[in-house]
């Protein structure tokens, strides 16, 4: 019978539990093999002793040094190539620079960070290059010392900041900073007539030859050489930019562009002007030509510019009045162009209130011109305006155009005469007709020659849109439409009658004035409109029914120019009853010119 499953009594417990394992030869061999391969002491599983790093740190340091050295060599090959040395001189390729690996090894031994080591190494390289430059003598470079010139080349090539080296050498040679004599131009394309140049390591023979070669380019030359530095002040006959100046000097002196410092001189610095002036009188400098104006103004006693008095506004107003400059921009620009010849313009440019003087000048000129216009009759005004027209034309072109438009010339002359003389209810002429018939061209040409004003109904929302009528002898409203006719029929009847009206002007109280001669152009024949019947007796109309003729080359068939109107008024002067001014002109009576400045008649110009 089989043994029962499950637990047995306590008495049979010892038989069920295996107390000692059975051993065999195979088991013993595997156990021994396992024990030999994985033998360990459990008591020494954790090692609490201090670890020794060994040479891993030194290995890492050597790897960082190697990488830094490779990066440095790549940068040197990139920025200090043999091609750059060959451009300066072929002899420089045979010159070996002083080794600096020794200092690099010391730096590597003292530093433990690759980044700090590289930065410190580069800083030390720059400082060592600057410190190793030998002191310059105060005597010029002797002839034949080609080795010294070559040394200057190598020193400049070794410098990472060649401009700083040149500035330091310049100050050591001349005792004054280069920036103390010059003002800076950032752009290479900015033109200037005067340039200051400092050239490093110029051969003495080339320096002497440049004194003669530069005379064909410059009005004034100032050259001085001390040790390896040569200083030039060149006043060119024409404005040049920095690139053009460098190209000229590199070809003339056989130098590289890196050897040149160039900036314009300071023009309003007395100390800088005295440096050039005293240097020109010394024996060590070469000068050719008259002193520039900016130097003479600040150094020579009794110079014409130093004798100029303070700015005189009345002289500026007189100049603008004589040249008919009314716009502020024209006055400012044209008067500034007079600065080299006019002492008052120089004083104005040196003043801090230039804009205020320009505004006051423009205002005063407008006041004088308006007063002069009001004093003149229509005959005098027309005579003065046509005398300003240069050239000759023929009045027949205007007469032919009127006949082409089927306008009776006699009737037009009668209406024009009444308008110019401001006859009540006859001082307004309307030119109407289809589009492209030459209405605007005809009236605009007349307004242009008589210096009239043009009014635009687009400004009718402003209560000052009629203000130009108080400042002219003849006015024009071009392309009158229905809204404008309604406005004229409502508000401008008294003005068209030739009576005094109250005209609102900006920045002043309303003034009492009469409307000047008025020209109108429109596509609407107001005489055919019943709604504007009150304007029929106040406006004289002429119709232009035919299209404006053009030549095959797209030029007008009829020349409506200032010269044509000049001939028109001259030819029909008596018919228009404009005889007063012409009679005075034929009598040869002299007229005194208007003077608005405080200058006396006997004062020198």
Swiss-Prot record:
Pfam families xrefs: PPV_E1_C, PPV_E1_DBD, PPV_E1_N
PTM notes: Phosphorylated.
InterPro entries: Helicase_SF3_DNA-vir, P-loop_NTPase, PPV_DNA_helicase_E1_C, PPV_DNA_helicase_E1_N, PPV_E1_DBD, PPV_E1_DBD_sf, Rep_E1_papillomaV, Znf_lg_T-Ag_D1_dom_sf
GO BP of this protein: DNA replication
Keyword Membrane (UniProt): no
Gene behind the chain: E1
Subunit record text: Can form hexamers. Interacts with E2 protein; this interaction increases E1 DNA binding specificity. Interacts with host DNA polymerase subunit POLA2. Interacts with host single stranded DNA-binding protein RPA1. Interacts with host TOP1; this interaction stimulates the enzymatic activity of TOP1.
Catalytic activity: Couples ATP hydrolysis with the unwinding of duplex DNA by translocating in the 3'-5' direction; ATP + H2O = ADP + phosphate + H(+)
Biological classification of the source: Viruses, Monodnaviria, Shotokuvirae, Cossaviricota, Papovaviricetes
Protein name per Swiss-Prot or TrEMBL: Replication protein E1
